[in-house]
Amino acid sequence: MNLRPLHDRVIIKRLDQESKTASGIIIPDAAAEKPDQGEVLAVGPGKRDDGGKLNAPDVKVGDRVLFGKYAGQTVKVDSEELIVMREDDIMAVVQK
């Protein structure tokens, strides 16, 4: 991947959603909702405050994060679908 996010932007790869329910029902791709979890692939340097101080992002590469269904902008890079979003659009980091 040759993307370097700017400012407080983060590049995320959606995690694959289960295609089968707990009861064994297979969900077709057309009916499945886009997952709202992903892995952080790249993080920008941060956002500057009004005084010009750079605030480092709270997320780091490798974090598993939760975000809204419509958060960010989907881009295709090297035939891979990625999401570019602001750090503010990330709701939580999933603790392991």
From Swiss-Prot:
It comes from the Bacteria. HAMAP family: CH10. Its main location: cytoplasm. GO terms for biological process: chaperone cofactor-dependent protein refolding. SMART domains: Cpn10. Gene3D superfamilies: GroES chaperonin. It comes from Polynucleobacter necessarius subsp. necessarius (strain STIR1). It is found in: Cytoplasm. InterPro entries: Chaperonin_GroES, Chaperonin_GroES_sf, Chaprnonin_Cpn10_CS, GroES-like_sf. Heptamer of 7 subunits arranged in a ring. Interacts with the chaperonin GroEL. Keywords: Chaperone, Cytoplasm. GO terms for cellular component: cytoplasm. GO terms for molecular function: ATP binding; metal ion binding; protein folding chaperone; protein-folding chaperone binding; unfolded protein binding. This is Co-chaperonin GroES. Pfam families: Cpn10. Together with the chaperonin GroEL, plays an essential role in assisting protein folding. The GroEL-GroES system forms a nano-cage that allows encapsulation of the non-native substrate proteins and provides a physical environment optimized to promote and accelerate protein folding. GroES binds to the apical surface of the GroEL ring, thereby capping the opening of the GroEL channel.
